[in-house]
Amino acid sequence: MPPKDPDSSRTPESRSKSNRPRAIRRLVIWYRRNAAVTSLVDTATSSASAAGTVAGTVANSMLQPLVFDPLRWLQGNTDDEEIQEADRLWVAVDGMGGDHAPGPILEGCLEAIERLPLKIRFVGETDKVLEAADALGLSERLAQAQAADHLDLVASGPSIGMDDEATAVRRKRDASINLAMDLVKKGQALAVYSAGNSGAMMASAIFRLGRLKGIDRPAIGALFPTKDPGQPVLVLDVGANMDCKPAYLHQFALLGNIYSRDVLQVEQPRIGLLNIGEEDCKGNDLALKTHALLRDERRLHFAGNCEGRDVLSGAFDVVVCDGFTGNVLLKFLESVGSVLLGVLRAELPRGRRGKVGSAFLRSNLRRIKKRLDHAEHGGALLLGVNGVAVIGHGSSKALSVVSALRIAHSAASHGVMEDLAALQSGCD
């Protein structure tokens, strides 16, 4: 018998259904191969229409983050073209601070001056900096940055190691972290960044810049992502003070309130106290006494206790806690992005449908990782000293350095120190 025409016994509706998987596969292949940004939207729309109802549904729910959002990002990613020389601010960088310094630190600085309105005073041991630049193929970019007066190399003496005691800042007076602090103190830089020994960073900031009047202990404040991409939450302290008094947490709240208002542009920051329950009567002695102080503070909008599950909910703009608890919270969050992606990869089907689904989800997974990746929030502010100081993770790579320098620039350009000085005068 002659073979039957496969389409002769099918209704138009059944033929349309059988073509849908093929149309979806074609759509996936197209998206992978097509790099023409100018025709992305038109092509995506026509492909979705050709794929029928199923692909249309997929397009509505999936192509928004996969096509339209990346298109907007590509069209808006022109920071380097908009930089005006008059807008550039000097930032001092401890070039020898970090597990892998000075190479990744230098690379991040060179990236930052191309993306952000910054000038860098890079403090480090000159021979090691030039060797690292040569090893990473950065020598030409470094020379160009120096010629354009965007980067200035400042020679330093032996650096302070990651395992050194904080008191080493007194012995090694010409260490890179000390000289970087001096640049801020002398007004030759508006902010300082270091990914080195955090204890030495704090000690140098206190000795060289000094504490703000009325602030007993500086605090490290880190920005945590929330379910709203445009609304991070500031958590402090995340590691500077292991044992705290209620008065310290009260001061942390005042510092965080100013930063959230000035830099994050939150009109009336909601202050939360990290605790084990929402009720006023919950918590240990530290939490109970701090709660009373924050409740009676008229300069703050105290929103009550914040449970651990509410830190990333968007219900609070500033959350205060002791440094021990905050550091545990910070380190836990650093692991969330990679663990979440690993679970999703393991759970996705491995057959044909799984491959198609994975192709559609790939961009979403990357965006999730980006929002949760601690490298995207590569710096924490040291609040309470008389200058803008940003602390980076010891293992910081170039991306983390750029992120930290963005934080430094934002703090320096939004008048944070002026308002902190006003807070200081209020303590007279």
Curated annotation (Swiss-Prot):
Residue ranges crossing the lipid bilayer per the database entry: none
Subunit structure: Homodimer. Probably interacts with PlsY.
Known catalytic reactions: a fatty acyl-[ACP] + phosphate = an acyl phosphate + holo-[ACP]
Molecular functions per Gene Ontology: phosphate:acyl-[acyl carrier protein] acyltransferase activity
Pathway this chain belongs to: Lipid metabolism; phospholipid metabolism
Disordered: annotated span: 1-20
InterPro entries: FA_synthesis, Phospholipid_synth_PlsX-like
Subcellular location: Cytoplasm
One of the GO biological process terms: phospholipid biosynthetic process
Keywords, comma-separated and alphabetical: Cytoplasm, Lipid biosynthesis, Lipid metabolism, Phospholipid biosynthesis, Phospholipid metabolism, Transferase
Bias type Basic and acidic residues, positions: 1-16
Assigned protein family: Belongs to the PlsX family.
The UniProt record lists the keyword Iron: no
Protein name: Phosphate acyltransferase
Lineage: Bacteria, Bacillati, Cyanobacteriota, Cyanophyceae, Synechococcales
